[in-house]
């Protein structure tokens, strides 16, 4: 039986798990979440649902950067 807590199947289809990529690239929460949803797109939930989740976190990050730069 697969370990659904530490190594869920929808993240373990290649040699790289999203958590390892997120850590290696030093991504923040928003960008890390986007990577996570892109990586599992179509493997856990519907691909469009997963990609829309990724898009939402990218939009959150863009808003945060714009706010930081005084554009909002």
Language model features by range: what are they?
Residues 1-72:
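Intrinsically disordered, low-complexity regulatory regions
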